[in-house]
Amino acid sequence: MIPIQNVYYMLSYAFQVLNEQGYKNIATEQFHNTAELMAAILEKGIAIQLKRGLGKEYIPQTEALSSLRGKIDIAESIKTQSTLRKQLICTYDEFSVNSIMNRIIKSTVEILLRSNISKQRKKNLRKLMLYFSEVDFIDLYTVNWNVQYNRNNQTYRMLISICYLVVKGLLQTQSDGSTKLMDFLDEQRMCRLYEKFILE
């Protein structure tokens, strides 16, 4: 079994951001399982991201409006007979924090809150999730993990990668379709995940 402290050092090697000043105190903490380690890294990373501001992106919206906004969907307006109610079906883009990356983070933290981590860590993560109130949950099985990063969302790279490790390492599907949380990542699984990180 790979010691949990070594897992942190492997992650530090893969993500140079963990060597920054804000993450130094994580290196000295003692962790009972990898879920606790991942939760600590996410807690610190989310707090830093919140100081920078949550990433936003344009989300397409379609709704019946009494005033024009964006493009008019004429076919849908006729089909729903919204003109009788003096409304039009409009399609527009809304600049929102409900981005894919924020949804992945919120859903992953929800998994960690149900896992075997300390009460204080759970409390801290719940406090951070208050800032994600406008963010929806996402089914983590359907997520495309090949996220495109640019200058604006580069700070999310490490957070999304940690979320990937949590989802692939802590979720185990049972025969009835429900999921249960594993207490730790077995050695083979951890080696495979780390190899994927090195290759990416």
Residue ranges and their predicted role:
Residues 183-199:
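Acidic-basic catalytic patches of nuclease active cores, encompassing PD-(D/E)XK
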Residues 1-180:
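Terminal, charged accessory segments of proteins
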